[in-house]
Curated annotation (Swiss-Prot):
PROSITE patterns found in the cross-reference section: RIBOSOMAL_S17 (PS00056)
Record lineage: Bacteria, Pseudomonadati, Pseudomonadota, Gammaproteobacteria, Enterobacterales
Gene3D superfamilies to which the protein is assigned, alphabetical: Nucleic acid-binding proteins (2.40.50.140)
Subunit structure: Part of the 30S ribosomal subunit.
Assigned keywords, A-Z: Ribonucleoprotein, Ribosomal protein, RNA-binding, rRNA-binding
Record GO cellular component, one term: cytosolic small ribosomal subunit
InterPro entries linked: NA-bd_OB-fold, Ribosomal_uS17, Ribosomal_uS17_bact/chlr, Ribosomal_uS17_CS
Function statement: One of the primary rRNA binding proteins, it binds specifically to the 5'-end of 16S ribosomal RNA.
Protein name: Small ribosomal subunit protein uS17
Ribonucleoprotein is among the record's keywords: yes
A molecular function GO annotation: structural constituent of ribosome
Amino acid sequence: MTDKIRTLQGRVVSDKMEKSVVVAIDRMVKHPLYGKFIRRTTKLHVHDENNECGMGDVVEIRQTRPISKTKSWALVRVVEKAVL
């Protein structure tokens, strides 16, 4: 069993909540029959303690203990700020 902490990168799609953001994670999946690669998106609720994220920011997140019913990811750092 490994104790490696799971980290992902994604784009912030909503920052309307207090201390929380919604991050969209894009991944490419191969179609089982036709072999074409399809883009799949997963939306995760992420804990943002200092409200430092904005819409469109690219962020790095890590898996953590459950903080609420839907939040079990926490913000590590803002990789790239969105251009307004």
